[in-house]
């Protein structure tokens, strides 16, 4: 595992020692090399997990998320160049250092064997993200957004720490690899019910569950482009990853505790999709669509069948790449039009025809067009939910229709129609931006050829 952690750490001195002209090229290329070497992790054999040491392990659930984490750093650096062009050198270097630190924490979160270590790293990701949002966001509301983000996440996570200490005292270990073989079921008692809530709430806030999702649109809208990308692509997946890991301990309580949360998620999925149809703010629309997609993942994880787990893992990876790409596209519009309001940025197809092609591709993957992995994930979730309860097909079908509606609404509003006069003299799309979009699209298209590598531990 150190062959990914140490090169990531060495990005720090590389950043601070690079010349002014080379700072972006050096860090982007080095991080791209790290992300390409991380593909070696896909070669897993034996008992389907790689035990690197007592501290780090990786199995077929954490590997896709790990590779996604490393793949995203060069993309974030590419996306942030224009945003930081007016900053002085020290601030650029500080920004890049924050992104590197965040990647380091995320790698350790996804490979931790010990639950307490996982918890510490899970909380540590909060710090760089908060600094990125509150220091480099666009409007002054970013401070409010940072406050929301901090308090929602902390309030959700503190009961988890208490629950983990309790588990440590009763079971004598917090090692994932040992807890897999823990066979003593939890009896139904009030204390165990509260423990279930404490364990799950931290991850439900992070996902976020409908009702606890208010920090997400705020944080997304106010964050700079790199902050939005890493939030949508990876930090939301931490919740799903944690839920899938910790449900091992919580059976059979999950069987009856899951009902209200599944209902809430199914309802929230429809509600947030409908909210998307009423949005005027482009980034806000993409943020709410994230909530709706993650509600599907919550439902899938709580049903706890092999198919739903496969669907949840596939959907997490697919959504990570798709929403990150949509945020990049929204940012490229924002850098030219200087407004996130969709009505002011309409008719861009005539001015930026290649960007319109990327918009079309991103919207189609967002609405889960076959043969994308978004569709594979959604189908698995829909089928497993249908076998759990037939009536859910109404909500699932409705959600798919509304998702298609708001994706096309977003595409048509931004790309079609007559463009407003104040955007006659905008810049054409840069090669950097097109490379950024193609690096988002490439994994999505390649994974649709071979989706089994991201179907998680139960494939």
UniProtKB/Swiss-Prot annotation:
Disulfide bonds: none annotated. The chain crosses the membrane at residues 22-42, 60-80, 98-118, 147-167, 196-216, 224-244, 256-276, 284-303, 308-330, 351-371, 391-411. It is a multi-pass membrane protein. It comes from the Eukaryota. InterPro entries: NADH4_N (IPR000260), NADH_Q_OxRdtase_chainM/4 (IPR010227), NADH_UbQ_OxRdtase (IPR003918), ND/Mrp_TM (IPR001750). Pfam families: Oxidored_q5_N, Proton_antipo_M. Its EC number is 7.1.1.2. Belongs to the complex I subunit 4 family. GO terms for molecular function: NADH dehydrogenase (ubiquinone) activity; ubiquinone binding. GO terms for cellular component: mitochondrial inner membrane; respiratory chain complex I. The keyword Protease does not apply. The lineage of its organism: Eukaryota, Metazoa, Chordata, Craniata, Vertebrata. Core subunit of respiratory chain NADH dehydrogenase (Complex I) which is composed of 45 different subunits. It comes from Ovis aries (Sheep). It is an enzyme of class 7 (translocase). Its main location: mitochondrion. It catalyses: a ubiquinone + NADH + 5 H(+)(in) = a ubiquinol + NAD(+) + 4 H(+)(out). NCBIfam families: NDH_I_M. Keywords: Electron transport, Membrane, Mitochondrion, Mitochondrion inner membrane, NAD, Respiratory chain, Translocase, Transmembrane, Transmembrane helix, Transport, Ubiquinone. It is found in: Mitochondrion inner membrane. Core subunit of the mitochondrial membrane respiratory chain NADH dehydrogenase (Complex I) which catalyzes electron transfer from NADH through the respiratory chain, using ubiquinone as an electron acceptor. Essential for the catalytic activity and assembly of complex I. This is NADH-ubiquinone oxidoreductase chain 4. GO terms for biological process: electron transport coupled proton transport; mitochondrial electron transport, NADH to ubiquinone; mitochondrial respiratory chain complex I assembly.
